[in-house]
From Swiss-Prot:
InterPro entries xref list: Plant_ZF_CCCH, Znf_CCCH
Originating organism: Arabidopsis thaliana
Keyword Membrane in record: no
Disulphide bond pairs: none
Gene Ontology molecular function, alphabetical: DNA binding; mRNA binding; zinc ion binding
Segments for region (Disordered): 1-110, 183-296
Compositionally skewed regions (Basic and acidic residues) per UniProt: 12-52, 86-110, 204-243, 251-284
Protein name (Swiss-Prot/TrEMBL): Putative zinc finger CCCH domain-containing protein 10
Length: 389
């Protein structure tokens, strides 16, 4: 304890004595400068001596000597000013060093460390402002120091929150970074997935370990993984080449078809084809509407088709006759179909004797009045339906 008290007393005495020593040195220097200035003035006045009678004697030396003296005096004055400034700067630097050493000595304390039980480590001052809403000071985050000090506008978190960050890049946790490539932090989220840069080349990566030997590492640029992609690309190229060849072969055909379509013969043929297709469609529709086609129409159909295939059908008269014949055939087919339907209808014919027996068995007696009347079969059937059914 006695040793510790002695050290603190000695430090306080040094603090009190240092400013006084510096002040004494500055006074001595100022006294020397004043003495040198007085000597210079006396030398300058010695060139011009005034007698008691008021007469000015001749100037000693020539004009060249006077000019040289003036230059020397100016140079001496400039050198004195420079030396004075340098002395002030050195004094201020020495004063600042003394103050910083005293501060470090006062702020230093014993910090416990598990590896080195007690270590004498300096603790930095908390002069930097903490602004949680602002961005972190980049220089402070890297070096734990800031040039602006308390005037800095950025955030300076305490040292406990940023351990082991000196000289290392941190992960940018702000999401989408606004600084872009100028940001000194890492961006692991943006590099995940497809945004990772693909390795170039197909050779395996060779890296050196601590012993100096090279070893293979797992890389995505092996040729085995890219054979499929290359094959797909080649197939795509082959399909494109085939399509181009087909187009080149098809172009002359298209040109020939266009030339033929402009000719009158080709137009007439196309018109006849369209006319045939329309007639065939109409005949099919009529056949489905009328039911079964008669045998006569089947007999006439080959002749009808033969007439259509003839080149003389281009005339209007032949076409009109064919249309009339077609209409007649349709009418005949309809008449025959109706007759067949009438024959297929069920007709009920009852004999009078049988009807009377049935009516007596059922208990009807009013029908005897109708027996004498001349009723037709239709009326008799209607009366039976009303009373019996």
């Amino acid at each position: 304890m006695a040793n510790v008290s002695f050290t603190f007393d000695s430090q306080e005495q040094n603090k009190e004595l240092r400013p006084s020593r510096l002040v004494g040195r500055s006074d001595e220097r100022n006294g020397r400068r004043q003495g040198t200035e007085q000597k210079k003035k006396e030398k300058e006045d010695s060139g011009f001596r005034v007698s008691e009678e008021g007469e000015i004697p001749l100037q000693q030396g020539s004009n060249t000597d006077s000019y040289a003296r003036d230059d020397l005096t100016q140079q001496q004055r400039v050198s004195d000013v420079v030396m004075q400034r340098r002395s002030h700067e050195t004094e201020s630097r020495l004063w600042q060093r003394a103050r910083t050493q005293d501060r470090r000595g006062s702020e230093s304390r014993m910090m416990f460390d598990g590896r080195t039980q007690w270590s004498h480590a300096p603790v930095l001052s908390s002069a930097y402002p903490v602004r949680p809403g602002e961005d972190n000071c980049l220089f402070y985050m890297k070096n734990h120091l800031c040039e602006w000090g308390s005037e800095c506008c950025y955030n300076h978190p305490p040292l406990q929150e940023i351990p082991c960050r000196i000289g290392k890049k941190l992960d940018c946790k702000a999401g989408a970074c606004k600084r872009g490539s100028n940001c000194p932090f890492n961006h692991p989220k943006e590099r995940d997935g497809d945004s990772l840069p693909m390795p170039q080349g197909r050779t395996p990566d060779l890296r050196r370990n601590d012993s100096g030997r090279r070893y293979n590492t797992e890389s995505r640029s092996w040729p085995e993984n890219k054979e499929k992609e290359v094959g797909q690309f080649r197939d795509h190229q082959d399909s494109k080449e085939d399509a181009q060849e087909v187009l080149l072969q098809q172009r002359p055909r298209d040109v020939e078809m266009r030339k033929r379509s402009r000719s009158p013969d080709f137009r007439a043929k196309t018109e006849t084809k369209e006319h045939r297709e329309a007639e065939e469609r109409s005949s099919r529709e009529s056949a489905t509407a009328t039911g079964k086609v008669s045998g006569k129409e089947n007999e006439l159909r080959p002749t009808y088709v033969y007439l259509l295939m003839m080149p003389e059908n281009h005339n209007v008269d032949v076409q009109q006759t064919l249309q009339e014949q077609r209409k007649r055939n349709i009418k005949k087919a309809r008449i025959e179909a109706r007759l067949k339907l009438d024959q297929i209808r069920p007709t009920v014919v009852l004999e009078n004797s049988r009807a009377t027996k049935m009516m007596i068995e059922w208990g009807f007696t009013d029908f005897r009045k109708l027996q004498g009347s001349n009723l037709g079969n239709k009326k008799w059937i209607c009366w039976v339906r009303k009373h019996c059914c």
